[in-house]
Amino acid sequence: MIDFIDYIQLSFSDATRWNRDNSYTALTDTANALLDFSIPERLRVHLSSLSTPQFATTYTLGTVGLIDGSISYLFSTLPLQTTQSRSTLIPLRKLVPGYRQIHPPLAPESWDSDGPGHEGSDGQEDETTPWKRRRETLLHAILHLPPPTTLNGLFLRRLSPTTQLSVAVCSTQAKPLSKSTPQASILTQLSHDTGKYSAEFLFSTDNALLGFKGLYNFGPDPRDRTNAQRPQRASQSVSLLSAGGEMYYSPLSSVVGLSTGLRFTTLPAASETLHSPSSSAYPAPSPISTFPYTLTLTLTPLTGSLSTTYSLLASPNLAFSSRFGFNVYSWESEMVAGCELWRQKRKPYPYVSGEKDDLAWAKRKMGLLPPLPAPPTPAKRMDLTAGAGESVESDSVIKLRVDQSLNIRLLWEGRVKDLLVSAGVGLGPTSLSTGGAAYGWTGVGVSVLYST
């Protein structure tokens, strides 16, 4: 379960319409959410609040063996009026990362009709145009306690409909008896997203590290006006193939990093085609699969690492994922499998009379009350994606992960009254003090979140 502040940051990205999926950093997000989830450490309590639509705070306290905590503040120039902040109302799927359905990339110019460069009557750029108002800023700071304290800061600003600037700062307090200056580093990231491709330029003061990330989407260019004018059925795609890479270089330490990857994923149209009426003028394309799935392939040439993942959404409440890694230099391999199962809490059908009546079933049988509406048909159930559907809401989720060494992680996350609870256990081989090996507990933890 992500932190409350991270949830607010994601809401800020959604409100400013920044596509975080169109990035090389998010190439394997689906597999990572299903396979690399972490269990809580010890007992942690989070108290959060979105006191105003523009200001949020979080207080965290950890105990059992070691007492630590943190204080977080967040400010946004964009009022998050529609963001749910109460722990009883926040959709659980927005807090628990899982299978992520990728949508077709959109051109930023299609957000509004004016777009960048719109001029007013005096020939100057109009400050009230919609794209000007989207130059929003987010400020975030978190202080980790106890000493040595660590301060993390984030400055995020939309420079244009296609560009975003992010500056992250990390500073650690020096030891009490040390006269050295506190360790600090700054990471600057400039992101550019056109829908067809995305590019990220990075610079870190830590060893003067320079980096570049890029992602290219094969298929029609969403910036092409002719594609937008075609009928929706003809231009609708059922899959998306993306290729990208990243490169790092530090002139001080002579460190070089390089990786490349591919991602093939089905789009929502792949499962909707079966239930959409066909048109004689524009026949419906054949779906690749009735189940949404995502395939990724990543390669790190310098270290010889090769990794493939396959994630499948078998139903709106069940997802599977697997990963196989291999190193061509050391011949070492890795195999991980995981799944998640959601429990849906169905809302009761509304009473026609407007009041709860224990004898409504008898009155309805006698014809005194109109019959209840029919439940959804199987075809409509197939159209439901994760978290979609008006008659169901997520109540809890169970995640399971196991690798070839029998390291097992089991995580349960759900809603208990007004609290959001996350509890997990870890099992695996452990080393004994006598030099032998045994199989036992590797971690147990519970995390509780309450927000207003």
UniProtKB/Swiss-Prot annotation:
Which cellular components does GO assign to this protein? ERMES complex; SAM complex
What keywords is this UniProt entry annotated with?
Membrane, Mitochondrion, Mitochondrion outer membrane, Transmembrane, Transmembrane beta strand
Q: Does the keyword Membrane apply?
A: yes
Subcellular localization: Mitochondrion outer membrane
Task: Provide the topology term for how it sits in the membrane.
Answer: Multi-pass membrane protein
**Top-level taxon of the source organism:** Eukaryota
Q: Where is this region: Disordered?
A: 105-130
Q: Name one GO biological process term.
A: mitochondrial genome maintenance
Q: In the UniProt entry, what is the domain comment?
A: Lacks alpha-helical transmembrane segments, suggesting that it resides in the membrane via beta-sheet conformations similar to those predicted for other outer membrane proteins and porin.
UniProt similarity note: Belongs to the MDM10 family.
- HAMAP family reported in the protein's UniProt record: Mdm10 (MF_03102)
Biological role stated in the UniProt entry: Component of the ERMES/MDM complex, which serves as a molecular tether to connect the endoplasmic reticulum and mitochondria. Components of this complex are involved in the control of mitochondrial shape and protein biogenesis and may function in phospholipid exchange. MDM10 is involved in the late assembly steps of the general translocase of the mitochondrial outer membrane (TOM complex). Functions in the TOM40-specific route of the assembly of outer membrane beta-barrel proteins, including the association of TOM40 with the receptor TOM22 and small TOM proteins.
How it assembles, according to the record, is: Component of the ER-mitochondria encounter structure (ERMES) or MDM complex, composed of MMM1, MDM10, MDM12 and MDM34. Associates with the mitochondrial outer membrane sorting assembly machinery SAM(core) complex.
Q: What is this protein called?
A: Mitochondrial distribution and morphology protein 10
Organism of derivation? Uncinocarpus reesii (strain UAMH 1704)
Ranked from the top, the taxonomy reads: Eukaryota, Fungi, Dikarya, Ascomycota, Pezizomycotina
